[in-house]
Amino acid sequence: MAELSTIARPYAKAAFDFAVEHKAVESWTEMLTFASLVSENESIKPLLNGTLASTQLATLFIKVCGEQVNEQGQNLIKVMAENGRLGILSTVSLLFAEYRNEWAKEVEADVVSATELSSEQQQQISVSLEKRLARKVKLNCSIDASLIGGVIIKSGDLVIDGSVSGKLSRLSEKLQS
């Protein structure tokens, strides 16, 4: 993944800089997300690494995307096709989203809980994280019954393990040392 990120970063940065300059960050986010989904489609994926000439591949890809991709987005697709990089479009989209979140002072946090969190609990977690991180927080909630109780919160390098299984594990380590 690190190698893909290294290759994809210049494309994502160029697209992001262009989007900011033209006040079109949200439309570029939608466009790259859609194009990324197209590139991951099982019918399209084999063509990205196939024997089609870059101009044919770009034309086909743009036709499949239709009106979801504007002229500047089509230019990005053409450049990536010429360089044999359409296969990393999903990584470009992810990096673009990271640039967008940084620019908008937003961060995503993964919250794993033993049971489904109520909207009030989600709001409390969101408010606490926003204070701690000084950013707007978007929660991605999931359920893992093996936690027994509590939550695990991950955002970037921050990991908060408030799960019962995590506490039991730490207690076990202390007792064994």
UniProtKB/Swiss-Prot annotation:
Pfam families xref list: OSCP (PF00213)
Entry keyword Heme: no
GO cellular component, one term: plasma membrane
InterPro entries recorded: ATP_synth_OSCP/delta_N_sf, ATPase_OSCP/d_CS, ATPase_OSCP/dsu
Compartments it resides in: Cell inner membrane
Keywords, sorted A to Z: ATP synthesis, Cell inner membrane, Cell membrane, CF(1), Hydrogen ion transport, Ion transport, Membrane, Transport
Example of a GO MF term: proton-transporting ATP synthase activity, rotational mechanism
Topology in membrane: Peripheral membrane protein
Keyword hit for Signal: no
Assembly mode: F-type ATPases have 2 components, F(1) - the catalytic core - and F(0) - the membrane proton channel. F(1) has five subunits: alpha(3), beta(3), gamma(1), delta(1), epsilon(1). F(0) has three main subunits: a(1), b(2) and c(10-14). The alpha and beta chains form an alternating ring which encloses part of the gamma chain. F(1) is attached to F(0) by a central stalk formed by the gamma and epsilon chains, while a peripheral stalk is formed by the delta and b chains.
Family the entry assigns: Belongs to the ATPase delta chain family.
Role according to the record: F(1)F(0) ATP synthase produces ATP from ADP in the presence of a proton or sodium gradient. F-type ATPases consist of two structural domains, F(1) containing the extramembraneous catalytic core and F(0) containing the membrane proton channel, linked together by a central stalk and a peripheral stalk. During catalysis, ATP synthesis in the catalytic domain of F(1) is coupled via a rotary mechanism of the central stalk subunits to proton translocation.
Protein name as it appears in the record: ATP synthase subunit delta
